[in-house]
Amino acid sequence: MLTQTTAIKALFIYPVKSLGAVSVSTLDFNSSGVVNDRRYMLVDSKNRMLTLRSHCQLAQFHLTQVVGGWQVSNQQGAGILIEDEASTDQLVDTEVWSTLIRTREKSRQVSQWFSEQLDEWVRLVEFDDLETRYCKVDQHQVPFSFADGFPLLVCNDRSLSQLSRAVDYPLAMARFRPNVVIDMPVDAEFKVSALNSDDGGQLLFIEPCVRCNVPAIDPLTGVFQKDLHPKLKAQLKRAGKVVFGMNACAIRCRQLSVGQVLAISEA
C-alpha cells in the first residue's frame, strides 16, 4: 500500500515547445490550461513542428520571464525578446502529432532570429485567437496548447535516482521534461490514479509516458549520447513499452506549489 500523501518537489513550464525548461515555484491554470506552458512553437518551411528528436540544439536555448514577455538566449548569451503583445496577421496551419491546429506567426523579427540561430527558415507561432484544443479524459475536457498528447507530465524523483544507479550515470530530471516532480517510492507513480489537493483540485493520472530518444540528449550540451540510449531503453521497459513518468491532466486546479502536499488515490 502506498503512503497516503506525496509532496511536490519541483515545477516546470516550457514557454516554447522543445526549448529549455523554466523552473517555477507555482504552476497556474486558466481557461487555456497551464499558464505559459507550450504557449509557442517553432515550425519549419513546411509548417511542421520542430522537436528535440530532430533538432537536439533546441535544448540549448534558455528562457527568462521579463516585463512584457520572454527573453530567449542562446549558449553565447545573445538573445531576443518574445513580446507578449507582439502579433502578425500571418496564419499558419500546422499539427501536433496529427492534431490539426491553426496558429499565427508571433513575430517576424523573432522568427528571423531563430532562423539565423538554426540555419534554416523557421517561424515562431502561437495559437490563433479562435483556436482551441482539448484532452478528453472520462467526462472532462481539459484545455491545453502545444504539449504532445496530454496537458501535464508527472515524474517521480526517487524513480530517477534509481534509474541513475541502474545505468551508472547521473541523470538530470531535465532529460525527461516534466511539469510536476513528486517524491514517492520507486515506480509508485504507476500505481496512482490521482493526486488530490485540499481545495478540491485533482491531478488525474492517465497513462505512462512512452519515451523516444529525447532522454538520451544531454540537456546541457544538446548532444545525443548514443551509448546511454540503449541502457535507458533496457531499464525503462514496462509491458513492452519504454516509459518514464505519467501523463496527467488537472481538474478544478487553480494553482500547484512547490512543497504542496497532495493526497494519493491508488489505481
Where are these regions (language model features)?
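Metal-cofactor-dependent catalytic cores
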Residues: 1-267
